[in-house]
Amino acid sequence: MFLLQGAQMLQMLEKSLRKSLPMSLKVYGTVMHMNHGNPFNLKALVDKWPDFQTVVIRPQEQDMKDDLDHYTNTYHVYSEDLKNCQEFLDLPEVINWKQHLQIQSTQSSLNEVIQNLAATKSFKVKRSKNILYMASETIKELTPSLLDVKNLPVGDGKPKAIDPEMFKLSSVDPSHAAVVNRFWLFGGNERSLRFIERCIQSFPNFCLLGTEGTPVSWSLMDQTGEMRMAGTLPEYRAQGLVTHAIYQQAQCLLKRGFPVYSHVDPKNQIMQKMSQSLNHVPMPSDWNQWNCEPL
């Protein structure tokens, strides 16, 4: 195991991961944030350097004090060799399997590795598999070979106009975390609320405020640079409002040089159509999350 330290190593890692997009996207986005201030205080581990086969991004041990907090106890993994990956993840200094944790990756082949480890280390695992989307602008910049112009929507990728008297674009405030938490599919508890508050305080997030000055639609970003937790109050749905929050956030990220990507549940046809209307393109790899609990 090798801990990457210093700006030069992390920049080399980012450059190397770029060659493996979109399979490495979750890890690539996380390393980009580490190279821009590292707001979540993460660390990068590789099996060897510089010719690594497996990379794991994880929090510092001192930040993982709550054994039940899988939002904090999150690992991002990319590997070019599954046998090597299983051996690397098996190391206690790489992953603390005694905790409730989650592993995220845009690499579906890791499922076999994690299921094998679940059998040998006695933990139960729940997998969430979703459609991975990347903005066409990001694809053009990072992986132009993936961009099939024939399949792009005809539109300009901009949302329809909304009534400026009714809705005002704003940033998300920490006081808005509770409403985001209430409607987040992976949230709804105290630990997820703390995670959302941390994301709001650390990254650019956007919302639409209604006439009462409270959020009616929003889009946030997590420590991997992914746009997540987007939602709209039920009484304001079917108006295309969330499209505005996501569009503004995407423009902000593009200006900063970050990849624009997100995931959508395969059953959520509405958000799939919304993603395509913004010229976000489904990727050949999936978005994966494995929630692991020791037995």
Curated annotation (Swiss-Prot):
E.C. number: 2.3.1.13, 2.3.1.71
Q: Which GO terms describe its biological process?
A: glycine metabolic process; monocarboxylic acid metabolic process; response to toxic substance
Entry's Gene Ontology cellular component terms:
mitochondrion
What keywords were assigned to this record?
Acetylation, Acyltransferase, Detoxification, Mitochondrion, Transferase
The reactions it catalyses are: an acyl-CoA + glycine = an N-acylglycine + CoA + H(+); benzoyl-CoA + glycine = N-benzoylglycine + CoA + H(+)
What is the reported tissue distribution? Detected in liver (at protein level).
Has UniProt tagged this entry with the keyword Acetylation? yes
Q: Where in the cell is it found?
A: Mitochondrion
Residue(s) carrying N6-succinyllysine = K15, K126, K140, K168, K255
Q: Which Pfam families match?
A: Gly_acyl_tr_C, Gly_acyl_tr_N
Extract one GO molecular function annotation from the record.
glycine N-benzoyltransferase activity
At the top level, the lineage of the source is: Eukaryota
User: Would the keyword Repressor be found if you checked this record's keyword annotation?
Assistant: no
**N6-acetyllysine: residues bearing it:** K15, K126, K140, K158, K255
For the protein in the UniProt heading, the enzyme class is: transferase
Provide the primary localization.
mitochondrion
Function comment: Mitochondrial acyltransferase which transfers an acyl group to the N-terminus of glycine and glutamine, although much less efficiently. Can conjugate a multitude of substrates to form a variety of N-acylglycines, thereby detoxify xenobiotics, such as benzoic acid or salicylic acid, and endogenous organic acids, such as isovaleric acid.
Q: Which family does it belong to?
A: Belongs to the glycine N-acyltransferase family.
Q: What is this protein called?
A: Glycine N-acyltransferase
